[in-house]
Amino acid sequence: MKNFKKLLTSLFIFSIFSGILFSQANQYTPDPNAQYGYGVPLSSIPQNAQDFIRQHFPNIEVSYIERDWDDIEVYLANGTQIEFFPNGDWKEVKTYTNMPDSILPQNVMATVKRTYPQAAIIKIEKQFTIFEVKLNNMMELYIDNNGTLIGQKFDD
């Protein structure tokens, strides 16, 4: 009898977690009106993604855009790669040229400059309320929205 109760409890917990997972999966269903694939035009991605590119990379031509159901990747002529969520919010920027200071909030940028003033930013990744900032000196900084340095590590 005890084993039967354990089995029922396990099945109940499993069904709850399965329901949660399937309900979250529905949040990421493809937009039927969006254009997907390789080489999609700039005009087909969300307006806030277009505005981000124009604001932070105004004189750099868009070379290529790839759009899947779960992200949008934009490649610029200078080698910069920008990754967006399907709603057009940016999630990652990689560059080997000058990263625009305007991408990060001022207090986050101030922490980067104060911590490693000679280093250049080559990658920024937004993870909820934390920014992962990779520098050209092989350091990765973890900074919250308030500009507090949470951690750092050598990226080997």
Range-by-range predicted roles:
Residues 39-59, 99-120:
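Short, non-transmembrane alpha-helical segments in secretory-pathway proteins
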Residues 1-28:
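Bacterial Sec-dependent N-terminal signal peptides
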Residues 22-51, 55, 155-156:
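Sec-dependent signal peptide cleavage junction
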Residues 72-75, 131-135, 139:
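Conserved histidines in hydrophobic membrane contexts and catalytic metal-binding motifs
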Residues 7-9, 13, 113-122:
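C-terminal low-complexity, charged extensions that often adopt amphipathic alpha-helices
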Residues 140, 144-156:
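Short, low-complexity, Pro/Ser/Thr/Gly-rich segments in the mature regions of secreted, periplasmic
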Residues 48, 53-96:
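Acidic (E/D-rich), amphipathic helical modules within compact regulatory domains
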